[in-house]
């Protein structure tokens, strides 16, 4: 019988002294499950900075939030319900901290609606939305809230999940790649990670009629206040905990370049990209809801027909093929075994399910352009984008 190599898992049982940090990391990574960190009361249009900084005493994989509350709509139905209501009640989330190598950074600055949609871009199951005890369908095409489901006169007990992954999202078979993006205690200055939430109001859900009233109370109650439950998920890495070269993922959601969607045209530059290692570029298009409170920004509709032949460009050359957005959109969906929701368009560079293939935007020369160009098909469109970037050298990739 031939001599077969001992599987890595069996070698670890006997001790990890002879293994490299990469071998250990590939074998030892067990998540501890969501651990309660903080409970934040909801107040309309408030933007609280959580009084406690995130406890980073173990490698951290994700932050999970749940908005739990009752919304009572009375007087009159909403005349228009926003496409992504009610997850628009959390307007924005900012995560910032001081990294020992990259100094003060903001890894997350995204709208609540985009955070809600994010997992669905990369896996079959997205964030959970439960209305009056009924799990809602996954985001699909189109994305449009039905007023009879939410927006008409009625009482709605809402449980809305917002999972914020700290690593790029890979398929289950490639989950160990997440280890190279965990927030390691030794990489950050003390307990400097700070979370800020930005809350909406009744205009976050759409356009209320003149007689519409909206009351926010505790989940399952006509009194009290809604709450945001915030949990953290840590990983146990064993001997690998202090040996991994961890990268930091940056996701900042921005509006398209001013005026770029105001006129119909071909090959229009709609956004400049940062010259950083890039794992994904996600676009979101539709129309903006008018008449909201000053600090509230909401998509009235999500629409795939605002842009066409969208390209990631370096020096006038596309870095990924795309002749029709519907083909590019469904290619990304096939690669991640999901349905890309209406209005969203993802250009992945890690459909290989490994960070080894991220686009080396950091190697684009100083005088070169790194941008998003597109044909613009309508003069009334609105859009945002997220360039998912990587700082550092995960896996010692250089």
Predicted regions, residues:
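Beta-strand-centric surfaces of beta-sandwich/beta-rich domains
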Residues: 1-398
């Amino acid at each position: 019988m031939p001599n077969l190599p001992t599987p890595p898992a069996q070698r670890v049982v006997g001790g990890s002294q002879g293994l490299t940090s990469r071998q250990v990391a590939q074998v030892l990574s067990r998540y501890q499950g969501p651990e309660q960190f903080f409970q934040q009361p909801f107040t309309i249009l408030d933007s609280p900075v959580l009084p406690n900084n995130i406890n980073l005493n173990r490698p951290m994989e994700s932050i999970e939030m749940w908005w739990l509350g009752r919304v009572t709509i009375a007087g009159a139905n909403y005349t228009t319900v926003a496409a992504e209501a009610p997850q628009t009640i959390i307007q924005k989330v900012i995560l910032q901290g001081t990294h020992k190598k990259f100094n003060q950074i903001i890894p997350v600055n995204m709208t609540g609606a985009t955070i809600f949609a994010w997992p669905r871009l990369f896996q079959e199951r997205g964030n959970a939305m439960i209305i009056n005890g009924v799990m809602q369908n996954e985001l699909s095409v189109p994305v449009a809230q039905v007023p009879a489901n939410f927006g008409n006169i009625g009482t709605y007990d809402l449980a809305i999940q917002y999972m914020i992954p700290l690593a790029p999202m890979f398929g289950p078979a490639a989950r160990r790649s997440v280890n190279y993006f965990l927030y390691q205690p030794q990489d950050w200055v003390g307990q400097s990670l700070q979370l800020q939430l930005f809350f909406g109001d009744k205009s976050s859900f759409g356009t209320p009629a003149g007689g519409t009233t909206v009351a926010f109370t505790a989940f399952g109650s006509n009194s009290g206040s809604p709450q945001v439950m915030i949990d953290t998920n840590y990983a146990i890495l064993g001997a690998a905990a202090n040996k991994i070269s961890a990268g930091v993922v940056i996701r900042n959601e921005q509006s398209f370049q001013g005026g770029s969607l105001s006129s119909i045209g071909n090959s229009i530059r709609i956004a400049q990209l940062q010259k950083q290692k890039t794992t994904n570029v996600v676009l979101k298009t539709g129309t903006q809801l008018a008449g909201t409170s000053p600090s509230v920004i909401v998509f009235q509709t999500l629409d795939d027909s605002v842009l066409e032949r969208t390209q990631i460009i370096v020096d006038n050359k596309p870095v990924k093929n795309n002749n029709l957005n519907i083909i590019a959109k469904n290619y990304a969906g096939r690669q991640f075994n999901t349905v890309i929701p209406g209005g969203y368009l993802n250009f992945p560079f890690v459909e290989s399910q490994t960070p080894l293939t991220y686009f080396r935007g950091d190697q684009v020369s100083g005088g070169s352009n790194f941008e998003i160009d597109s044909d613009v098909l309508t003069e009334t469109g609105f859009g945002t984008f997220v360039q998912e970037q990587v700082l550092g050298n995960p896996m010692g990739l250089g």
